[in-house]
Amino acid sequence: MTESKRILADVLLRPVITEKATALMEQRKYVFEVLPTATKPLIRAAVEEMFRVRVTSVNTLKPPRKQRRVGRFVGYRTRPKRAIVTLAEGDSITLFPDT
């Protein structure tokens, strides 16, 4: 595996499996947690390389951090950056293999 392919493989952390994300799959939109430093072109290249599909658009979002309190001390828990990837007509990603 070359260095560039290894970097692309590290960009996508995991797919997001929620009710909303599952409903988006019917519209050829897939949600992934990505590295906080990942850019849209890098996410597009990673999805196209790993799943052999054509990506039409990439939307990213970074949810606000959550406040956590332990006694009198206040801290924050960061939330992971997410990418919503829209695929071209006729392409799909199999996240749940048939058993």
Curated annotation (Swiss-Prot):
Q: Write the record's keywords in alphabetical order, separated by commas.
A: Ribonucleoprotein, Ribosomal protein, RNA-binding, rRNA-binding
Give GO cellular component annotations, separated by semicolons: ribonucleoprotein complex; ribosome
Q: Which GO terms describe its biological process?
A: translation
Kindly list the GO molecular function terms attached to this UniProt entry: rRNA binding; structural constituent of ribosome
Q: Which PANTHER family match?
A: 60S RIBOSOMAL PROTEIN L23A
User: NCBIfam families in the record, alphabetically?
Assistant: PRK05738.2-4, PRK05738.3-4
Function of the protein? One of the early assembly proteins it binds 23S rRNA. One of the proteins that surrounds the polypeptide exit tunnel on the outside of the ribosome. Forms the main docking site for trigger factor binding to the ribosome.
Instruction: Provide the family line.
Output: Belongs to the universal ribosomal protein uL23 family.
The name this protein carries in UniProt is Large ribosomal subunit protein uL23
